[in-house]
Amino acid sequence: MMMNAFFPAMALIVLVGCSTPPPVQKAQRVKVDPLRSLNMEALCKDQAAKRYNTGEQKIDVTAFEQFQGSYEMRGYTFRKEQFVCSFDADGHFLHLSMR
């Protein structure tokens, strides 16, 4: 009777021990050139000022994110209208999305 419960328990332990852990995924981080990020910020502010018909000084850029092949800058106007500027991997402006 004890043997009937022992074998399934051992089989379960062996099978669990055979599974491989999932591989650790690491994001690639590349240091962005400060001059490039400042140029991208200025271009983003310029495009947002044109879109929202206001001055660049009334535009705040609050976040800068890097993805595999692109960059995004998030910001808002003095009226709290949110937007996202998208750039390609070389830092060229792609588009501005209103949120």
UniProtKB/Swiss-Prot annotation:
Covalent lipid adducts (N-palmitoyl cysteine), residues: 18
Membrane topology: Lipid-anchor
Ligase is among the record's keywords: no
Database matches in InterPro entries: YsaB-like
Keyword Isomerase: no
One family name in Pfam for this protein: YsaB
Localization, UniProt: Cell membrane
Keywords carried by this UniProt record: Cell membrane, Lipoprotein, Membrane, Palmitate, Signal
Annotated signal peptide: 1-17
Origin superkingdom: Bacteria
GO cellular component: plasma membrane
Lipidation (S-diacylglycerol cysteine): 18
Protein name per the record: Uncharacterized lipoprotein YsaB
Species annotation: Escherichia coli (strain UTI89 / UPEC)
